[in-house]
Amino acid sequence: MHEYSIVASLIQMCESHAKEHNAASIAKVCIAVGERSGVDSALVKSAFETFRLDSPLCQNTILEIQSQSVELECRDCGHYFQAQNLTYSTCPQCQSHNVIIAKGKELHLLSLELDIQS
């Protein structure tokens, strides 16, 4: 369940940004989870709901998770495309089998909404 360590790191990163900007709290965290990242979005959500309670800055934080679809790249012609079958894909442009996953393996912090009181 590496999702727990991912969420712990995510909360630490968010707290660091919040403190850097003198935020009173973190209103919203938005992340993107790639379809082939190996991360279970439901477990991330569950872990976040638990761990946020231990953070004074995240007590009422909303977590928004966006799914990032897989995009493949042909290493022969450079064409980017989405495929139905990710275990075996052929470039629709040049019919090459020399393709790699270009997007969809990552987990990104997209945005933070901070409550800043002056």
UniProtKB/Swiss-Prot annotation:
Binding site for Zn(2+): C74, C77, C91, C94
Family recorded in the similarity comment: Belongs to the HypA/HybF family.
Residue positions binding Ni(2+): H2
Listed InterPro entries: HypA/HybF
Domain of life: Bacteria
Phenotype of null mutants: Cells do not produce hydrogenase or urease; addition of Ni(2+) to cell cultures compensates only poorly for this loss of function. Normal amounts of apourease are produced by the cells.
GO molecular function: nickel cation binding; zinc ion binding
A biological-process GO annotation: protein maturation
Key words of the record: Metal-binding, Nickel, Virulence, Zinc
Classification via HAMAP family: HypA_HybF
Protein name listed in UniProt: Hydrogenase maturation factor HypA
Task performed by this protein: Involved in the maturation of [NiFe] hydrogenases. Required for nickel insertion into the metal center of the hydrogenase.
Family annotation (NCBIfam families): hypA (TIGR00100), PRK00564.1 (NF001839)
Family annotation (PANTHER family): HYDROGENASE MATURATION FACTOR HYPA
GN (gene name): hypA
